[in-house]
């Protein structure tokens, strides 16, 4: 078993026209590293002395089954836990220390809390740009904080942000090692004030998010305002996400596609366990949502699944329609945001009010 990533299988053409014998190679298990001794101790010392530690969980926490380990570390420190863009399943949503996702259309609570950090533990994340870019007018990345970055891939450490300590290792193992290496007084500095601030900040953001019905127009544009005036009885994407979130089963698996309609949803779904949020990430493959959720249902036929896509992205996935229509395939739920346009491209491609080739019939 190797690190998670895409795989390609090449099958010679003549193999499809005959019965063949194959021998499957034996699975080789690799022991994942838990980090270097000196780096771990340096990181543990920084966390032990931190006055406002913050943990940022990435996909590595999910892939390493490290969510319980990161929770134990967070609880020892009473550190708020954020997650990377579209990795909302990297920490239990009901946990009082969970501050939500960073990045595009993420959690303002998470952004405000990490901006106060003096030490950030970036656990199992490459710190990709979409997970650290400003949001809601807040340039929140704590430029003066000590950054501890943990990644199984050494090439990613320090790639996008300056780091104080880099640890090459499995996120779960590193979290466990750090917890066992903390000093007796770790987390004690400002603990009560920090816990109160986390609760207050989360509550304020939850109320604000509930009241956000529409997207604001970019300076110089009026797309959203005109869309609301044209169809005042239609739900906005934010209204739809709120309604879906309220009705969604707690154990559901969801998939997302690219585009603004789905990206708006970064602030809404939360999960109690990992491998519940399938998202295209920075690769940005248009048409990802439908086939991803179909695959999830085949793998987990007894778990409810919900896919999300805009009408443009969904239109790219018509091959999958022939597959899911087969009687032996389990049923899936697919939510289509219908705005009859390539909305993200239309929003960013204009001269005055003239738009070309971005409408869908």
Report each predicted region and the residues it spans.
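Glycine-rich, acidic loop regions that bind phosphate or pyrophosphate groups
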Residues: 87-206, 327
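Short, solvent-exposed amphipathic alpha-helical segments in soluble enzyme
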Residues: 1, 24-26, 65-78, 135-140, ...
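Thiamine diphosphate
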Residues: 111-114, 160, 166-168, 172-176, ...
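Glycine-rich beta-alpha junction loops
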Residues: 11-16, 59-61, 87, 154, ...
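Short internal beta-strands
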Residues: 10, 79-85, 148-151, 334-337
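Anionic-ligand anchoring segments at beta-strand to alpha-helix junctions in alpha/beta enzyme folds, i.e.
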Residues: 35, 42, 48-120, 246-291
